[in-house]
Amino acid sequence: MKPLKILISNDDGVFAEGIRTLATSAASRGHKVTVVCPDQERSATGHGLTLHSPIRAEKADELFGGGIKAWGCTGTPADCVKLALNELLDQKPDLILSGINHGPNLGTDIFCSGTVAAALEGTLDGIPSIAVSVASFQWKNFSFAGKLSLDIAEKAIQQNWPKNLLLNLNIPPCEEKEMGDLVWTRLSIRQYEEQFIRRVDPRGNTYFWMAGEAVTDLQSAGEGPKGWPSDVSQIAICSPSLTPIQPDLFWRGNLDDLPNLI
């Protein structure tokens, strides 16, 4: 296919292995790649925007090489994509990829996901966009995730990407030979047991660390074909999960319009 102009962002920051793998994978296929992402870890920032302080962008080409242009920005993931589209890029991209995230973005986790928010900025601007995550914080082999996300993107673009469709791809932490087939999935509802750790600083002021653990994964948020499994259940059986969402969160369009990816 003709080389694509691809914008890549994330919420793990410019030094994360996932985004470097994704950018290198895209460039190796001949695509023109630009990276605009946070200059440090900004996970779980959701769709937050920076309105009360300046956003600074510093060139970071040397972190990627291979002709990839890159910036590290002081803003949120959503800030980064907005800045790229309105100031840093000479041309509108054909595709936006967000990730590869270090950790899952499953079910209702997408509400607080900076990875999904960055991709959603592209969807809101009419650009085909995919959020890509490896469903483990410890897994460090991102090569298959990079390959699969680009295979999906290229195939979907060739089939005329439907308006308002955002694809949320989660890949299980296992070797490719052990992995099941990619399938369409529905969003799970993830319920957490929230925990706050109370501490006191050297000046006697109380502060808190928030932690939470998923204690219940309901089968589905109730939208989509009933024959589709939930995204959480797919990852649990070591199979990649591909969930179509849109700005009001679930794809409610004509199912015949979905790209033929499975």
From Swiss-Prot:
Report the locations given in the UniProt record. Answer: Cytoplasm
Lineage of this protein's species?
Bacteria, Bacillati, Cyanobacteriota, Cyanophyceae, Synechococcales
Which regions span the lipid bilayer?
Answer: none
Quick one: where is this thing mainly located? cytoplasm
Identify the residues that bind a divalent metal cation.
11-12, 43, 101
The gene that this protein is the product of is: surE
Name the Enzyme Commission number(s) assigned to this protein. Answer: 3.1.3.5
What is the purpose of this protein? Nucleotidase that shows phosphatase activity on nucleoside 5'-monophosphates.
Note accompanying the cofactor annotation: Binds 1 divalent metal cation per subunit.
What InterPro entries does the record tag this protein with?
A: SurE (IPR030048), SurE-like_Pase/nucleotidase (IPR002828), SurE-like_sf (IPR036523)
- Protein family per UniProt: Belongs to the SurE nucleotidase family.
Q: Which UniProt keywords apply?
A: Cytoplasm, Hydrolase, Metal-binding, Nucleotide-binding
Q: Which GO terms describe its molecular function?
A: 3'-nucleotidase activity; 5'-nucleotidase activity; exopolyphosphatase activity; metal ion binding; nucleotide binding
Cofactor(s) named in the record: a divalent metal cation
| Protein name in UniProt | 5'-nucleotidase SurE
Which chemical reaction does it catalyze? a ribonucleoside 5'-phosphate + H2O = a ribonucleoside + phosphate
Query: Its GO CC terms?
Result: cytoplasm
The first-level EC class reads: hydrolase
**Which Pfam families does the record match to this protein?**
SurE (PF01975)
